């Protein structure tokens, strides 16, 4: 089995092949996201703790978190699921995925170093791969340089050098996202003011409508009562005329 081990602190990754079954037994029957001591891999791994982040079986099917089985299952996957990338909007597809429990049928197991041990691993912990781009979000720039809210983030943006042959060297900086400026605060105040204005207008319109509705209902009630009174008068008039006619006979 191959072990694809990464160390986020240095940005390095290393693929090692382990033929000895006894060294791998420590990972068997463990689930994804479990932290395991890597002492069994050899003397240089003493003190290291790794997290199982995934893997692929011998046919190339990936492990999926949450599928509690050793074998392969076919799941209906949609946008947002791991192990699937939709090609069309709203597309769903039934795909074969492997369970999240590690066993001997895997060809590659992905591990992430959580805790560094006593010794350095050549090509993994002794070298550092510099990041190609710096942070873009304002809060992340603050976190990187340990800045307070009063400090100006724009001065600390990591600039990317653009060196072309025969041209003047220049640098390029990303646009800072979520940067709080007076203009942003003004926009926020305007949004809140407009919202309050809309609420006030809606309340006034609702009150006006309720007033008009009450007026119309009162008019309709008066009209109905008038009609009822008219009918009663007519019926009483008919009754009195029929009585007088019968008495005359």
Swiss-Prot record:
This is Small ribosomal subunit protein eS6. Component of the small ribosomal subunit. Part of the small subunit (SSU) processome, composed of more than 70 proteins and the RNA chaperone small nucleolar RNA (snoRNA) U3. InterPro entries: Ribosomal_eS6 (IPR001377), Ribosomal_eS6-like (IPR014401), Ribosomal_eS6_CS (IPR018282). The modification (3R)-3-hydroxyarginine is found at residue 137. Residues 236-249 have a biased composition (Low complexity). The modification N6-acetyllysine is found at residue 211. Keywords: Acetylation, ADP-ribosylation, Cytoplasm, Hydroxylation, Isopeptide bond, Nucleus, Phosphoprotein, Ribonucleoprotein, Ribosomal protein, Ubl conjugation. It is found in: Cytoplasm; Nucleus, Nucleolus. SMART domains: Ribosomal_S6e. Component of the 40S small ribosomal subunit. Plays an important role in controlling cell growth and proliferation through the selective translation of particular classes of mRNA. Part of the small subunit (SSU) processome, first precursor of the small eukaryotic ribosomal subunit. Residues 217-229 have a biased composition (Basic and acidic residues). The modification Phosphoserine is found at residues 148, 235-236, 240, 242, 244, 247. The modification ADP-ribosyl glutamic acid is found at residue 35. There is a cross-link at residue 14 (Glycyl lysine isopeptide (Lys-Gly) (interchain with G-Cter in SUMO2)). It comes from the Eukaryota. Ribosomal protein S6 is the major substrate of protein kinases in eukaryote ribosomes. The phosphorylation is stimulated by growth factors, tumor promoting agents, and mitogens. It is dephosphorylated at growth arrest. Phosphorylated at Ser-235 and Ser-236 by RPS6KA1 and RPS6KA3; phosphorylation at these sites facilitates the assembly of the pre-initiation complex. Mono-ADP-ribosylation at Glu-35 by PARP16 inhibits polysome assembly and mRNA loading, thereby inhibiting protein translation. Disulfide bonds: none annotated. One of its GO terms (biological process) is cytoplasmic translation.
